[in-house]
C-alpha cells in the first residue's frame, strides 16, 4: 500500500519555481558549435543519439556495433533546449519522451527509478544494471525542469516531473554512503533540488542529512575517498557546482562551498605544469593522460588565464562555469623547484596515503596500498614537455585485461618508489565488486605484470632484460634516466621472466608470471604468488642501486634506497593482505 501512495504522490506533485534561463550571443555560438558535433548522430527513427559501442568492461553484455545511449541523448536534449531555439524544441521533446519511456517506474521493481545504458540492452539484460543512472539521468532531467519546463508541452512536462521524482525515490532507496564520492554528491544534488522543486518534505529531510554527512566525511579528511581522480574529481566538482547554483537551502550551500574548494585544491595540488598532466596516484581513471577537454576546462575556469591553447566548447559550459579559486591558479602554470605532496586519503589502520613528487623534469605518484583494478593508477609517472609527454604505469593482466585481485603496496621517497604485489583470494577479476573471483578460482592462460608506456615512449620499442633482476635503464633527453627493476616475481612454481612488446600506440615491458594452456587456477593452492619492483627517476649522477629482496616467514621483504617493504607471499583474503 505504501508503494501505491508513492505512485499517487509522484503523479500529483508540481514544480514550485519558474525558469530564469538566459544565454548571450557569444555563449549561444559556442553552444551551437558543441551541438554540431552531435547533430549528425541523431537518429530520427529511434529519437536518440547513435554512437559506437564503448564500455568500461562491466554492467553491459554488449560487445560492439552501434548503440543509442540514454545519458548521451539526455545531454543532447538539454543542449538543444539551452539554445532557446523553438525550432529545436520538437527534437528535444522527442528525445525526452523516448528516454523517459525506458525508465523503470514500478516501485516494486528492484531496478525502480533507473535506466539502461543503451536502448539495445534493457535493464533485465544488463550484467548487472547500473543504479547510478538514476543519479546521472535525474541530474540531466532536472536541468530541463529548472530552466525549460515552461517551454515544454504539458504532456512532456508532466513526464519530466514524474521521472525526476522516480529517480529521487530510487536514490533515496539505494542510499549511497559518502565513500562513493561522485554518486554521493550527485545523488545529494538530485534529492536536494527535487525536494525543493516539488515540495517533497521527506526527500528534503533525507537529502539535507545525506549532504551533511558527506560534507563532514570529506572536510574532516581533507580528501575524497575516490581520491585524486581525473574522471570523478571533475564529476564531483561539476555536481557541487550544480548544488551551489540550484539549491536554496543556506546550510547546504555553505557546506557545498567548502567541498567545492576541496575539489579544486585536489586538482591544483596534483597538477604538473611542465607536462600539463594530472599527476598520480589516481583512485579511478579511464585514461592515463588528460588532454584538450581538461585543458579547456582550466581555460574556462580561469577566464583564459591558464591557457594551454585549448578552449573547446562544452555543452554545459553556460550553465556550469566552475570558476577556479584565484589563489590556486599558479599551481597550473608554475613549478620551478621540486615539490612533494603527502596526502592521507583514507584514515585508518593502516591508512591510505598518496605520495606525489613533482619535479621540473617529471612527476611520480604512488599510493601506499590499493589494488590494480582497471581504473586504478596506484603507480604512475609522466615526463617530457607539454607537446611530447610520456607516461608509464604498472598493471596486472589476466588474459590481457586488468586483474583487480592484484593487491598493491608501496613506499616512495622523492623520485624513487619501492613496490610489491600479491593476490587476494576474494578479490575481483575484471571489477573490484561486480565480478569477484568465486572460491578463489578462475581460469587463465596468461598472468603478467606490465610496465605500460604511452605518449612519445608508447611508440618506442624496448629490449627486455636477460635476467629478472636486471634493471631496465631508459635514457631521456635533459639529464633524466628512468630505471625499472623487478628483483622478485613468483607464481606458484614459476619464476617471472621479462618480455617486451608494442601495438603502435603503447609499448610495454612485462614480467610474465604464467603463459601457457588455459587452466584452472586456485589461488588458495599457491604457496607463493608475489612480486617486488622498484622505479627510479634519476637526475644528475644518480645511479640505480640493487634491491635487496628475501623471503622468510611467508613474507617477501624488500630494502632499497633507505626504504623497506614487506608483504605476505601466499594469496589470502583482502582483509589479510591489506592489514
What are these regions, as identified by a protein language model?
Residues 2-13:
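Bacterial N-terminal signal peptides
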Residues 19-98:
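Extreme N-terminal leader/anchor segments
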Residues 29-57, 348-372, 376, 384-407, ...:
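Generic detector of solvent-exposed, compositionally biased contiguous segments
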Residues 65-247:
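Aromatic-lined, polymer-binding surfaces characteristic
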Residues 211-250, 254, 258-266, 527-579:
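Signal peptide-directed secreted proteins
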Residues 247-366:
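Carbohydrate-active enzyme catalytic cores, enriched for enzymes
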Residues 310-480, 489:
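Catalytic and substrate-binding regions of extracellular carbohydrate-active enzymes
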Residues 404-579:
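Extended repeat-based interaction scaffolds and adjacent low-complexity, acidic/S/T/P-biased segments
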